[in-house]
């Protein structure tokens, strides 16, 4: 009987991308990558990274909140810190935008100081376990639908952080349908050609930026990740 070997792949036909919570937390703390403006991809991904995959409880200011799968409860101050906004109202404004896009729903509790949000359709793409237990927020992974990422990227001008995540979500590895992916992960924007090569003009249209800005950001990110 041949020995079993685990193959690591990210194929183009798979409709969602695995994202590690530790990776998102590193991005939150990386002040060298700008998030000004933005399409909302970064903000939505941050919310997903904290969402529960089973029911648990969280106590804030002496009040215990029940948190179901796909939900999380936090203070507005915490939310503003994750989103790196100067004012709390800016963080809440981003929640309003994501809610209008039917990606989340949220309510303000505790006299407006606590936010409880829900990722809509969470169970379609992620685990939703029935039993109650604490959920780790700094380990493990979750799945982000590629279609949702594309919808957000197409909705507005992308920030540097949005671009990092778009490249991550678009990565294909070890798939015979995409050239070069057997050597290492390549960003492939699913245009049906199987060729990952893309022009600055195409990236400019995708991210809502000028070609010069796209070139500058990619060079910056290349230097940052090499360092």
Model-inferred region functions:
Residues 40-47, 163-167:
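Short alpha-helical "packing" element that flanks the helix-turn-helix/winged-helix DNA-binding module
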Residues 109-133, 199:
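Short, cationic-aromatic polyanion-contact patches
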Residues 17-24, 48, 79-80, 90-96, ...:
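Short linear motifs at secondary-structure transitions and domain/linker junctions
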Residues 121, 130, 158-159, 168, ...:
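Acidic, metal/cofactor-coordinating or nucleic-acid-engaging core segments within structured domains
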Residues 1-41, 54-71, 126-161, 186-192:
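Positively charged, structured surface patches that bind polyanionic biopolymers
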Residues 53-115, 175-227:
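Winged helix-turn-helix DNA-binding recognition segment
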């Amino acid at each position: 009987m041949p020995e079993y070997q685990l193959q690591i792949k990210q194929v183009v036909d798979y409709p969602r991308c695995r994202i590690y919570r530790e990776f998102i937390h590193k991005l939150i703390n990386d002040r060298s990558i700008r998030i000004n403006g933005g399409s909302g991809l970064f903000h939505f991904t941050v919310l997903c990274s904290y969402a529960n995959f089973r029911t648990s409880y969280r106590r804030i200011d002496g009040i215990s909140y029940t948190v179901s799968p796909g939900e999380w409860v936090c203070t507005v101050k915490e939310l503003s810190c994750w989103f790196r906004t100067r004012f709390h109202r800016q963080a809440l404004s981003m929640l309003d935008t994501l809610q209008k896009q039917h990606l989340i729903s949220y309510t303000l509790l505790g006299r407006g100081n606590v936010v409880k949000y829900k990722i809509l359709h969470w169970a379609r793409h992620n685990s939703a376990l029935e039993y109650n237990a604490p959920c780790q927020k700094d380990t493990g992974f979750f799945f982000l639908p590629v279609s949702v990422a594309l919808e957000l990227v197409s909705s507005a001008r992308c920030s540097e952080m949005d671009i990092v995540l778009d490249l991550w979500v678009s990565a294909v590895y070890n798939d015979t349908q995409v050239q070069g992916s057997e050597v290492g992960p390549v960003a492939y924007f699913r245009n049906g050609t199987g060729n990952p090569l893309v022009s600055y003009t195409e990236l400019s249209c995708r991210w809502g930026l000028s070609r010069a800005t796209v070139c500058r950001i990619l060079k910056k990110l290349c230097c940052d990740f090499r360092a």
